[in-house]
Design a protein with these regions (language model features):
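Extended alpha-helical targeting/anchoring segments
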Residues: 1-327
């Protein structure tokens, strides 16, 4: 698989869509490196994918028979607070209303990247040999029959807590964060479609993990695409990037704040992955992500920060998200 620059990736997606060629796409956070490959040309020794039960790895999701060793080194609280304060200063200064702050966390486990792919349970999974594995629960956009839909996911809580669902839905900070991202995604979809509406607001998803169940809130936003959209799949998708749920609002200024606060390169983490086949485009945000660098594994995780956020709660949410859905 050959990495492509932005312009080449857009043109390739447009061509495949125009010709009705089924293809896989993987796009990094900054849209500087992308893979766009016809499905029948993917080498399974290098790349495996499974998106909502469809892919090139029929054994994906098989039960893991062994014991999982899982240790990680979270950021020092002082380091996280320093990054948090950079974000908060900009929030209070009016430069952003919502900023997604993420971390790069060293991980030690007996699982290989391929093990995680084969045995994890997630809506969207991708493995690139010796690079990374992603097991994402978050849909980015779907395009089908002239409609585009997006499903931003914001708000997380331990499902074992008493009254967890009510606590999550009643949390003022989580509600404000979710409202902001829904408004951002609605505006994004309005750039490429018409008659944009919020079809469902703050519904609850339950996710199983190796550390226990969690609850997350999502919304569904829909719009009507132009008649020639299959000929412009690359143009449409790239115009929506990076995903609003993993940047914030307003997007351009917030990305500058992220670069200042995080101090590392996200790479493919928080990019998007997906495929196009039979007239349908399906994609996911690349969250829940383990990367391999020089033999060391890193779990990348984060969450949305608003002016109402407390650093301790956000720090604990990052730790809560460092899991694998193997059970």
């Amino acid at each position: 698989m050959k990495a492509l620059d932005k312009e080449t990736a857009i043109a390739r997606m447009n061509t495949f869509g125009r010709n009705g060629t089924p293809f896989l796409f993987v796009i990094d956070y900054m849209q500087e490196h992308s893979y766009v490959e016809p499905l029948d040309g993917i080498d399974t020794s290098v790349c495996l994918y499974q998106f909502r039960g469809t892919g090139n790895a029929p054994d994906a999701g098989a039960r893991y028979a062994g014991t999982i060793d899982w240790e990680f080194t979270p950021p020092a609280p002082a380091d996280y607070r320093r990054s948090f304060n950079t974000v908060r200063r900009n929030l209070l200064g009016g430069n952003s209303y919502l900023t997604n702050l993420t971390c790069k966390v060293p991980l030690r486990t007996n699982l290989t990247l391929k093990d995680v792919f084969l045995h994890s349970h997630a809506l969207y999974k991708l493995w690139l040999k010796d690079r990374f594995v992603c097991f994402s629960p978050e849909i980015f956009v779907r395009m089908e029959e002239g409609r585009i839909k997006s499903f931003p996911m914001k708000g997380t809580i331990d499902a074992t807590l008493p009254h967890a669902e009510s606590i999550l839905l009643d949390d003022a900070k989580e509600a404000a964060e979710h409202a902001t991202i829904v408004d951002l995604i609605r505006n994004d979809l309005s750039m490429v479609s018409e008659h944009v509406t919020v079809a469902s607001y703050r519904y609850i998803d339950r996710l199983q993990t190796n550390k226990g169940p969690i609850l997350q809130t999502s919304s569904e936003i829909c719009g009507m695409l132009p008649g020639d959209y299959t000929k412009r799949l690359g143009d449409i998708l790239f115009s929506l990037l990076p995903a609003g749920s993993i940047t914030g609002a307003p997007k351009p200024r917030t990305m500058q704040i992220i670069a200042e606060a995080e101090g590392y390169e996200r790479g493919f983490y928080t990019g998007v992955m997906g495929c196009y086949a039979d007239g349908r485009l399906d994609s996911a945000v690349m969250i829940r992500f383990i990367e391999q660098e020089d033999g060391q594994l890193y779990f990348k995780a984060g969450g949305g920060i608003t002016a109402q956020s407390r650093w301790e709660s956000e720090y604990n949410e990052v730790i809560q998200k460092i899991y694998v859905p193997i059970y």
